[in-house]
């Protein structure tokens, strides 16, 4: 089970997305790296999976995940940042009898949600680790750092935002003491992430 430990009880893993295709034009709807990230957080009273996608070695991964969850003995919660990231949520929810609600009242202690108005996304905040977990609206920038998603990623919305409007909608995230941003697309920012976030939203 190839987990990258971000902090005590906080892990990230990457897996190739089955719908990825090479040669995408920059700024297009397919402009993202082949591997996408998922997060495992051992919250005080639950084990939380965010946007989980099983890797190609799924059976061995599941065996190790079974062991980890059994050892913890906590309920499992699976959270989805955006509809496109349902990924293997339903299979894992059945396997672990997990909650999939992201309503604020149902979130486990240690997890907060920040719906991005009109953007179809909920970004999760893990205060213990000062970590943000976005879906498609904040992504890794080539060469490091962060950027907002391309305009093309917003076209499907009923009332599409401009990039300027999207940045404004995410402005309140800068009020958080962010140290890490665990993006799904691209490389996570694990230090000085507030500076990177501020630059992305400028």
Give the label of every model feature segment.
Residues 1-45:
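Zn-dependent metallo-beta-lactamase
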Residues 2, 15-19, 46-56, 112, ...:
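Metallo-beta-lactamase
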Residues 11, 99-101, 112-114:
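General small-molecule cofactor/ligand-binding pocket signal
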Residues 23-25, 59-65, 141-146:
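A short, polar/proline- and glycine-enriched secondary-structure boundary/capping micro-motif
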Residues 34, 58-61, 85, 117, ...:
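Amphipathic coiled-coil/heptad-repeat helices and related helical stalk/stem segments
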Residues 56-105:
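Active-site metal-binding motif and surrounding structural segment of the metallo-beta-lactamase
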Residues 109:
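Active-site-adjacent helix-turn-beta-strand microarchitecture at beta-sheet edges
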